[in-house]
Amino acid sequence: MKFIFAFVLCLAVAQTALGAIIGHDKVQPFAQPDPVTISEKAAVKYKPQLVIFDSCVSFPAVNAAGDITGGLKGTSGTDACTKAPLGSQVYGRSTWYQGKWAMMFAWYFPKNFWNLESRSRHLWANMVLWLDNPALETPTILGASLSRQTLEVPKWLFIPSGVQQKNSYSKATPIPPMGFVGTQQIRTARIGRFQYTYNYTGGSTISTRVSQSYPDTSGWVGLDFTYLDGQYQDLIMWNQLTDQARAALESADFGRDTKVPFNDKNFEAALAQAWPF
């Protein structure tokens, strides 16, 4: 009897240490702290905007106590996920990688989508922005890598209804002009039946804009550069999270199809896959 009591007590202590699984709309996001270090200042300066097309908005995945989101069942389209009532969140982590400064920005979504249909619970998406040196007054953006899903495509009558992606990142060096906040495209001349030349006016040289949309005609939802301005979310860097939140993101099980890309377990491997040079 004493053994059973001790075992149950240990389970309770472990659960308290790791936090609980709570409703997707009950997770309190972290407020964006004032940046102090060089890496924090660069991350805030180059934080991207996110635009949502036909899928869930981004939600916080963990709170200060280490409680983890339970996500949403992959049914009923965008029901219950068109607005994050407590606010959205973008997560960040930076490091030197093969002589370039890599800044990962990651978003969590409570549902995953294929071809405009909600299909499963949980999705992590991320963007890696590559700089020359974060210590410079205005670092140069060398390129960007946007995550995509390599899941098997659904089948119709045993026939795949699309093409399965082989690479987990799309890569751009340099970033296309329309990938920057505020940029407008102006058609200047026609050079073929469906071909034109363009000029690009205005826009930032620092802040990028990406969409959670469908880069292919049909397929799994993923990140892509977009022609519309979006919204910023409060940024919390990996080292700014509480110990409980970091521990929760290390141990949380979001399923076999999506992983936390910026935790200790996955960060280096993600940068290797995202490397565009």
Swiss-Prot record:
GO cellular-component term (any): extracellular region
What upregulates or represses it? Differentially expressed during the developmental and plant infection phases.
Q: Does the keyword Secreted apply?
A: yes
Matching InterPro entries, A to Z? NPP1
Q: Which residues are glycosylated?
A: 199
Q: Which residues form the signal peptide?
A: 1-19
Taxonomically, the superkingdom here is Eukaryota
Q: Where is this motif: Hepta-peptide GHRHDWE motif?
A: 119-125
Q: Keywords in alphabetical order, please.
A: Glycoprotein, Secreted, Signal, Virulence
Q: Where in the cell is it found?
A: Secreted
Q: Which family does it belong to?
A: Belongs to the Necrosis inducing protein (NPP1) family.
Domain remarks in the entry?
Key residues/motif important for the effector activities are degenerated in most NLPs, including the nlp24 peptide consisting of the conserved region I (11-aa immunogenic part) and conserved region II (the heptapeptide GHRHDWE motif) that is important for phytotoxic activity.
The entry's function note states: Secreted effector that contributes strongly to virulence during infection by P.capsici.
- In its UniProt entry, what is this protein called? NLP effector protein Pc109095
Origin species: Phytophthora capsici
